[in-house]
């Protein structure tokens, strides 16, 4: 009657098989040791308004690449440039990582906020003990929940009502 195999039977067959071992070791590779946080690359996602930024940081010289463009070209506004660089300034890691980011949606302010959150989350993932307290205190790990309020029927905008005439 058992024409079909259950998921549990398949899992048992795989775990009993000699093909699948728990760990893989190579004689040529060095054993992994936890340690220097500057060596590990990190990645994270940041969101703000309608913008989404996928961020990857790797050890380097502080070069920013956003959608294939430099930081100065992508964010010509100096306020936005300072905004996205704040997580590095707070953690005193300015110039020690290269940032590669893909951003879509939203406007320039939302994209800058999304990029800042993504960079902060990536720094947090690289070295939790060293970076998290500074980033948390500065408020960089908190996603800004504010979004555009929808327009309601019978109103001109989200809250603006047509002019009221008493008589």
Swiss-Prot record:
Region named Disordered: 1-45, 137-167
Keyword Lipid biosynthesis set for record: no
GO CC terms of this entry: cytoplasm; small ribosomal subunit
Biased composition (Basic residues): 153-167
Ranges of compositional bias, category Acidic residues: 9-19
Pfam family, one: Ribosomal_S9
InterPro entries linked: Ribosomal_Su5_D2-typ_SF, Ribosomal_uS9, Ribosomal_uS9_bac/plastid, Ribosomal_uS9_CS, Ribsml_uS5_D2-typ_fold_subgr
Extent of Polar residues compositional bias: 20-36
Presence of the UniProt keyword Iron in the record: no
SUPFAM superfamilies, A to Z: Ribosomal protein S5 domain 2-like (SSF54211)
GO molecular function: RNA binding; structural constituent of ribosome
Listed Gene3D superfamilies: 3.30.230.10
Entry's Gene Ontology BP terms: translation
Compositional bias per record (Basic and acidic residues), positions renumbered to this chain: 143-152
UniProt KW keywords: Ribonucleoprotein, Ribosomal protein
Family to which this protein belongs: Belongs to the universal ribosomal protein uS9 family.
HAMAP family registered for this protein in UniProt: Ribosomal_uS9_B
Protein name: Small ribosomal subunit protein uS9
């Amino acid at each position: 009657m058992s024409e079909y195999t259950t998921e549990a039977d398949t899992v048992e067959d795989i775990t009993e098989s000699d093909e699948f071992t728990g760990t893989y070791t190579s004689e040529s590779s060095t054993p992994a040791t936890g340690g220097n946080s500057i060596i590990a690359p990190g990645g994270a996602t940041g969101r703000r308004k309608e913008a989404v930024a996928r961020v990857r940081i790797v050890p380097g010289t502080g070069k920013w690449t956003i959608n294939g463009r430099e930081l100065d070209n992508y964010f010509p506004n100096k306020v936005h440039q300072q905004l996205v660089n704040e997580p590095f300034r707070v953690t005193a890691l300015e110039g020690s990582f290269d940032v590669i980011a893909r951003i879509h949606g939203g406007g320039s302010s939302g994209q800058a906020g999304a990029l800042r959150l993504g960079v902060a989350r990536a720094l947090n993932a690289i070295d939790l003990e060293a970076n998290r307290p500074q980033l948390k205190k500065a408020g960089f790990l908190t996603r800004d929940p504010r979004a555009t309020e929808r327009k309601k029927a019978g109103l001109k905008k989200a809250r603006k009502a047509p002019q009221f005439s008493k008589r």
